[in-house]
Curated annotation (Swiss-Prot):
Lineage per the UniProt record: Bacteria, Pseudomonadati, Spirochaetota, Spirochaetia, Spirochaetales
Record-level GO cellular component terms: cytosolic large ribosomal subunit
Keyword terms of this UniProt record: Ribonucleoprotein, Ribosomal protein, RNA-binding, rRNA-binding
Organism: Borreliella afzelii (strain PKo)
Gene: rplN
Protein name as catalogued: Large ribosomal subunit protein uL14
Coiled coil: none
């Protein structure tokens, strides 16, 4: 579960390393976001000469959470970190690569491009 002020790792090659959630999109009083939800982030750490800079505000989709997610068959899946992938205005990924595993729930949330770029889908 991601809420405002949560720090996340950026799991793509846009150049950002660490981001902070500043808004959970989808309702005025919505507090938490889970895998497949869109949030607004601010980049806190970035590598030099990259497409995103420190202080950039952009939208992102959550691909991994430390909080477990229950699936229909009764199994639970959780990850070691909270991670997101930066999106452009058309809600497609800005980077060309996605690092680390991503959850299968992204397929249900219609982020097929992120799923196809990922090296592993769990």
């Amino acid at each position: 579960m991601i809420q405002m002020q949560t720090y996340l790792t950026i799991a793509d090659n846009t150049g950002g390393k660490v981001a902070q959630c500043i808004k959970v999109l989808g309702g005025s009083k919505r507090r938490y976001a889970k895998i497949g939800d869109i949030i607004t982030i601010v980049v806190k750490q970035a590598i030099p000469n990259s497409s995103v800079k420190k202080g950039d505000v952009c939208k992102a989709v959550i691909v991994r959470t430390s909080k477990e997610v229950r699936r229909k068959n009764g199994t639970y899946v959780r990850f070691d970190d909270n991670a997101c992938v930066i999106l452009d205005a058309n809600l497609s990924p800005r980077g060309k690569r996605v690092f680390g595993p991503v959850a299968r729930e992204l397929r249900d949330a219609n982020f097929m491009k992120v799923v196809s770029l990922a090296s592993e889908v769990i």
